[in-house]
Amino acid sequence: MKKLYILFCLLTMVLLTADAQRRYLDQMFPVVRTADVVYGKNISILTGMPAAEDLKVDIYTPAGDAKTDRPLVLISHTGSFLPPLYNGQVTGARTDSTVINIAAALASRGFVVGCYTYRLGWLPTSPDQNARTGTLLQAAYRGIQDTRSCIRYFKKSVAEDGNPYGIDPSKVCLWGIGTGGYLALGSGCVNDWSEVTLPKFINTQTLLPFIDSTLLGNLYATTQTPLCLPNHPAYSSNFQISINMGGALGDSSWLDGEAIEPTYAGVHCTSDFFAPFYEGPVIVPTTNQFVIYATGTRKCIETANNLGSNDILKTVDPNLDVLKNLIDGQKSTQTILPLTQQNILLGTDNFYAFDIPIIYNGKVVPQGSPWEWWDLNTLKVIVQIVNAQRGTNFNADTLHLNGLATNPDMSANKGRAYIDTTLRLALPRMCVSLNLGCQAVAIEEVDDAVIGLNLGPIPAKSEVRFETKAEYPIESIHVYDLNGNLVKAHTDINANRYVMPRHSLQPGFYLAQLKTKDKLVTKQIIFND
C-alpha cells in the first residue's frame, strides 16, 4: 500500500506538470496518418437520390509520442460544397495539399489532427435564385451537422472506447479552409433555431424557411428525420477555438457572445472574389453567380472581439505572438477594399489580413486562396481516371487555368509560406484557448473537502457517482491509469452531480481528475468485477 501511495503521489505530480510543456509551438515528431476512419453515417443528396453515406476522417498523430491527453484539431477542406472537378476547381477534398500540409505541421508539434469529409451537394447552376441560395444554405447546414458529429465521435472515443487516439476532449479546435471556414465559424455560433430563419434565409416565393428541421434534422444532427441520422447524440458538440482561412458566416448576428461559443481567429485576403473580406456577396466558383450576402472573416473576428468571446486571447504571450506588431499596424491602417470599395480599418485583434495587390502582371487578378497548390501532371492522371470511370469529360488544362485565374503564381513554396503565417497567428491563440501550458494558467489544486467532493462507491462495478458543493459545479472529469495514460474523459458536465459509467475500463486502480472553474481535485477510484 505504501508503494501504491508513492506511485499515486508521483503520478499526480506528473499530471499537474504535464501541461507546462511548450511543445505545441515547434515541430518535434514524425507523423503517422490513418486514413478513412468512419466517424458517422448520414443522408447524402449528392446524386439526387437520398442515400446513407459513410462520413470519413483521416487522422494524423505524432509518432512516438507518449502523451494521451493531446489537443485535437479537426480540419474541414474547401470545395464549394461540391466534389473536386465537379466544382470547377482542382481542390475540394481532405487530401488537398493545403489540408495535408497543415495537418502534418500540427501533428508534428504534438496535436492530433482529423481531416474530415462532410456531405456535399447543392444546385449552383440553377437559374432560380431561391434554388441556389436555399440549396447552398442546406449544404452549409449539413456541413455544420457533420462537423458536430465528428466532434462527438472523438469525445465518444474517449468516454467509451479507451481513448484510442490519445486526446483530451476538452481541448478541441476547428480549422476551416475556404468553404470549410463556413463550418468552423458556423459550428461555433449557430445554436438557436431563430438564427437560421432570418428574413434573408426565407424563400421569397413560398415564404418558408430554406431550412426545415423536420427534413434536415436539428442543428446538431441528433434527431432522426428523412434526411438526417443521429450520430453519438449523448455527447457535447462544443469546442474551444475556431480558426478560419478565407471562409465566411451567413450572418454576423449569429455571433452573440454566448458562453458556449469558442474563441475565434482567422486570416483573409483583401481581394478575395468568392468570399467577402469584411461583408458582401458570396460568389461560387462553379458559376460565378451571386448566392447570398455574408459576413467575412475580418468582421467576424472584430465582432467576436467586441462581444467578449475572445477576451481570453488578451492573455496571449506577446513573446509568442510574432505577428503582434504587424497586426497592430493593420489595426491603424485605413484601406479601401478593391472589390467592394468599403472603407475600413484593415485589421483587428486575432486576425491577419493578406493584403495582396489586385494587379498582377498588369491585369486585375483577385486572389483569395494563395495557400493552395497542386501538380498539373498529377491532375492530368486523376482527370483521366475519373473520366474513364464515370464517363465525364473534365479537362485538366481547363481546371488548371481556372485555379491560376485567382492564384496566378501558384506554387508549393508560396502555399507553404501563407500556411506558415497562418500558423504563427493560430498557435499562440490555440495555446491559450486550449490551455496547453505554453504559459501559466491560474488553477488551484485543492483537497476534496474544499469543493465538498463526495464520490462512490469505491470500489465500483459499473459506475462512480461524483457530487460537489453548489458553488463548485463540475466542468470535467479525466481518468488516468497508473501509467499516466488518459483512458476516459467527460467534458462539458456543468453540474454538481455526475454519474460516470465504467464502459470499457478494466478492473484496477485509476486516478480521477475533477475540474471546476478554478479548482482541481485528484482522487483514486477502483473498478472491480
PLM regions with names:
Residues 305-439:
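C-terminal catalytic histidine-bearing segment of alpha/beta-hydrolase fold enzymes
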Residues 80-96, 111-141, 397:
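Cap/lid segment of the alpha/beta-hydrolase catalytic domain
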Residues 68, 131-145, 149-178, 193-198:
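Gly/Ser-rich "nucleophile elbow"/oxyanion-hole loop immediately N-terminal to the catalytic nucleophile
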Residues 69-79:
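Short beta-strand element of the alpha/beta-hydrolase
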Residues 206-312, 321:
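The feature captures the conserved acid-bearing segment of alpha/beta-hydrolase catalytic domains
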Residues 1-24, 438-444, 458, 485, ...:
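Bacterial Sec-dependent N-terminal signal peptides
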Residues 21-68:
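N-terminal cap/lid segment of alpha/beta-hydrolase-fold proteins
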Residues 447-529:
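C-terminal outer-membrane/trafficking sorting elements
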